[in-house]
UniProtKB/Swiss-Prot annotation:
<comment type="function">
    <text>Directs the termination of translation in response to the peptide chain termination codon UGA. Required for the proper translation, stability and normal processing of UGA-containing polycistronic transcripts in chloroplasts.</text>
</comment>
<keyword id="KW-0809">Transit peptide</keyword>
<dbReference type="GO" id="GO:0009570">
    <property type="term" value="C:chloroplast stroma"/>
</dbReference>
<dbReference type="InterPro" id="IPR045853">
    <property type="entry name" value="Pep_chain_release_fac_I_sf"/>
</dbReference>
<feature type="transit peptide" description="Chloroplast">
    <location>
        <begin position="1"/>
        <end position="21"/>
    </location>
</feature>
<dbReference type="GO" id="GO:0016149">
    <property type="term" value="F:translation release factor activity, codon specific"/>
</dbReference>
<dbReference type="Pfam" id="PF00472">
    <property type="entry name" value="RF-1"/>
</dbReference>
<dbReference type="InterPro" id="IPR004374">
    <property type="entry name" value="PrfB"/>
</dbReference>
<comment type="similarity">
    <text>Belongs to the prokaryotic/mitochondrial release factor family.</text>
</comment>
<keyword id="KW-0150">Chloroplast</keyword>
<dbReference type="InterPro" id="IPR005139">
    <property type="entry name" value="PCRF"/>
</dbReference>
<dbReference type="InterPro" id="IPR000352">
    <property type="entry name" value="Pep_chain_release_fac_I"/>
</dbReference>
<protein>
    <recommendedName>
        <fullName>Peptide chain release factor PrfB2, chloroplastic</fullName>
    </recommendedName>
</protein>
<dbReference type="Pfam" id="PF03462">
    <property type="entry name" value="PCRF"/>
</dbReference>
<keyword id="KW-0934">Plastid</keyword>
<keyword id="KW-0648">Protein biosynthesis</keyword>
């Protein structure tokens, strides 16, 4: 399958016996110049020009398949990905992403800019994405993995083979996505130039709209490129624990947990309450939720730390200003077969107790809640949200496994202090973000200095700005080219 722009041009060459001409690619028609849409062409010999179909553009969302072209050459999908990634994609007249950036076309607002402005914004995003993914290192790693996969004895060790295969597939997916996005930009530019030459206002309008849509998508792809660590694609547990301060801190902890539930739902993640210990008057002492979704951990890891609230207390009859703290921990849920720590039954102490809560006619009157203690480390996991003891035990074991895996990862990277069970004192010196509701209104991240003046939107789950700024700053610290 192949998609081509077919038009008249002075430079000609021959592919498989067919005369092709174009600054990109074109087929010669003896009677007139022919514009062929970005449709997908069949290679069935019975059709004229090996099945090349003619007509105006019908669907701008269809792509060029796996063909990358530069000047008078193109690479088919039969070439290796690494070779294709090294090749420089270009428009008919030799315009590349690098040249677009070098041209320094002004980047205006989406509603004000012309096609050059949109193209420059997208090209800039592609450059940022490649830098964040460390493109050259990916190419080297891909070659190493490809060599491993070609070894005849690879599957003598199925565990190792599976790991290599998964990593190769992950890298391939990332790189193909970027290359396809880059080619799509250049295709749109070719289409716009062609539409102008042919005075085709409809084609020009549709292509410009596609370019604007692509500009919006490019920002999402920039964010995705920040999530390149091994565990970033995982689902996760988010734990919130109230600091010292009684009812005031318990209420703040409940607000923080509700903020994460709303954030997760806005990102289309599924949320399940695993454990919750209610406060005596209001709020929660602690709570754990399970967030299921691709890259849930990659995003949520930016929230680890102590969150501070300054407000007029609704529980103080004197209407005085109070400061409250809540600690947040995020634990990745590794995929099946990826656990780092093997848990022996002899290392566990399992305690059963009656679930807490507000009571009433639906109060659980059986000892269905479960607390599991890992004796060697002292790490505990509790679940009381399920109705049966069996379900609570299974959920608690899953949480314990994830905590132990995280502890092992922290030990291996000399980062034990960041582990959820090693959280330092929940107080002034360890805060990452401050939420001020009085005497002024502001939320400020102390790590990146990113701030907003609308605390309500943040508490309603609008966290992406904080997450993006943290992930960007973390990457920039590790990036020698920055």
């Amino acid at each position: 399958m192949l998609s081509l722009i077919i038009r008249r041009s002075r430079s000609r060459f021959i592919i498989h016996g067919i005369k092709i001409s174009c600054n990109s690619l074109s087929a010669v028609d003896s009677s007139s110049s022919v514009l062929v849409s970005r449709r997908t062409f069949s290679s069935t010999p019975a059709l004229s020009y090996f099945g090349f179909n003619y007509g105006k553009i019908s669907n701008l969302n269809q792509r060029f398949g796996n063909y990358a072209y530069s000047g008078s050459s193109f690479a088919s999908s039969t070439r290796s990905l690494s070779s294709e990634a090294v090749a420089v994609a270009a428009t008919c007249d030799g315009l590349t992403v690098e040249r677009i950036i070098a041209n320094q076309w002004p980047i205006l607002d989406e509603n004000e800019g012309d096609w050059k402005s949109h193209a420059a914004a997208i090209a800039q995003s592609i450059q940022v994405i490649k830098r964040r993914l460390q493109w050259k290192k990916l190419l080297v790693r891909l070659k190493v993995l490809s060599a491993e996969l070609n070894k005849s004895d690879l599957w003598d060790d199925p565990t190792h083979a599976g790991k290599i295969s998964r990593e190769h597939g992950s890298l391939t997916g990332k790189m193909k996505g970027v290359m396809t996005f880059e080619r799509e930009l250049l295709e749109h530019i070719d289409m716009l130039k062609l539409a102008k030459e042919e005075n085709d206002s409809e084609l020009e309008s549709e292509t410009l709209k596609a370019l604007i849509d692509m500009r919006r998508v490019s920002k999402e792809k920039e964010l995705e490129a920040l999530l390149s660590a091994d565990n970033d694609p995982c689902s996760c547990y988010i734990e919130v624990q109230a600091g010292a301060g009684g009812t005031e801190s318990n209420d703040w902890a409940a607000m923080v947990m509700e903020m994460y539930k709303t954030w997760a739902q806005r990102r289309k993640f599924s949320v399940t309450v695993v454990d919750e210990a209610p406060g005596e008057i209001a709020g929660i002492k602690r709570a754990t939720i399970k967030v299921n979704g691709e890259y849930a951990y990659g995003y949520a890891k930016a929230e680890v730390g102590v969150h501070r609230l300054v407000r007029i207390s609704p529980f103080d009859s004197g209407k005085r200003r109070h400061t409250s703290f809540a600690a947040v921990a995020v634990i990745p849920i590794l995929g099946d077969g990826s656990t780092r720590v093997e848990i022996n039954d002899s290392d566990l102490r399992i305690e059963r107790f009656r679930s807490g809560g507000a009571g009433g006619q639906h109060a659980n009157t059986t000892d269905s809640a479960v607390r599991i203690v890992h004796i060697p480390t002292g790490i505990t996991a509790t679940c009381q949200n399920e109705r049966s003891q069996h379900s609570n035990k299974a959920s608690a074991m899953a949480v314990l496994q994830s905590r132990l895996d995280q502890l092992e990862m922290a030990r291996q990277t000399a980062m034990n202090a960041q582990h959820t069970q090693s959280l330092t004192e929940i107080s002034w010196g360890n805060q990452i973000r401050t939420y001020v509701l009085h005497p002024y209104r502001m939320v400020k991240d102390l790590r990146t200095n990113y701030e907003v003046s609308d605390p309500d939107s943040v508490l309603e789950g609008d966290l992406d700005g904080f997450i993006l700024s943290f992930l960007s700053s973390s990457l920039d610290k590790d990036d020698p080219e920055h």
